[in-house]
Amino acid sequence: MGQKINPIGLRLGVNRTWDSRWYANTGEYGKLLHEDVKIREFLTEELKQAAISKIVIERPHKKCRVTIHSARPGIIIGKKGADIEKLRKKLSEMTNADTSLNIVEVRKPEVDATLIAQSIAQQLERRVAFRRAMKRAVQSAMRLGAEGIRINCSGRLGGAEIARMEWYREGRVPLHTLRADIDYGTAEAKTAYGICGVKVWVFKGEILEHDPMASERRAVEGDNQGSSSNRRRENA
């Protein structure tokens, strides 16, 4: 089942945590969930060029806190913080609550699965050869500390008559191992021949302690190399 299931969902509560972190009163859950979907769709569309990795939504008492993980925080903040203030006001109108907006920089976008998938999708739209795009992404990730990476591209690759799936892997990607810190991301490339799908799995090592926040803390700190205290590396 580890081959089929979303690797982030499989590890929730083990070494990953949820991207929406709030509790709802009876009857409010559906409304707040729909609100979260609208917030994510709005920010993803509004900040296409900002290389957004993920959006975390928290709801303290009658407030809303949105944290955007981005490889290009300067695009979101704008000149003297003007753009981020406009975004905050729009989000406050959408949620009807006092909304705060935080930006977290992704220090190593080359090992972030979502950003890798977005990059490959953009290259496919620019008619870059899919094998070259995949190989370049794999080499960059391995050079910057990933222990393994797998990339799947599917669709009418290269304008072929029949859709197919091509994949490229380097290193280890142990999908069944729950303690493995595996990042997963997807993207769509809208090409002249139709939509091509991109899936990326990045293995960043093993998290030995039981801590649902461990993976996020490591990503924020840029500690993708890991340390001997919380990660076990396999000997070659």
UniProtKB/Swiss-Prot annotation:
Region entry Disordered: which residue ranges? Answer: 214-236
User: Does the UniProt entry include the keyword Ribosomal protein?
Assistant: yes
What the protein does comes down to:
Binds the lower part of the 30S subunit head. Binds mRNA in the 70S ribosome, positioning it for translation.
Q: What organism, scientifically named, is this protein from?
A: Brucella melitensis biotype 2 (strain ATCC 23457)
For this protein, the record's InterPro entries field holds:
KH_dom, KH_dom-like_a/b, KH_dom_type_2, KH_sf_prok-type, Ribosomal_S3_C_sf, Ribosomal_uS3_bac-typ, Ribosomal_uS3_C, Ribosomal_uS3_CS
Report the sequence similarity comment from the record: Belongs to the universal ribosomal protein uS3 family.
Would the keyword Translocase turn up in this protein's UniProt record?
Answer: no
Note the Pfam families from the entry: KH_2, Ribosomal_S3_C
Q: Which PANTHER family match?
A: 30S/40S RIBOSOMAL PROTEIN S3, SMALL RIBOSOMAL SUBUNIT PROTEIN US3C
- PROSITE patterns per the UniProt record, alphabetical: KH_TYPE_2, RIBOSOMAL_S3
* Annotated KH type-2 domain residues: 39-107
Q: Which GO terms describe its molecular function?
A: mRNA binding; rRNA binding; structural constituent of ribosome
Please describe the quaternary structure of this protein: Part of the 30S ribosomal subunit. Forms a tight complex with proteins S10 and S14.
- Which UniProt keywords are given for this protein, alphabetically ordered? Ribonucleoprotein, Ribosomal protein, RNA-binding, rRNA-binding
- GO BP field: translation
- Record-given protein name: Small ribosomal subunit protein uS3
Q: Name one GO cellular component term.
A: cytosolic small ribosomal subunit
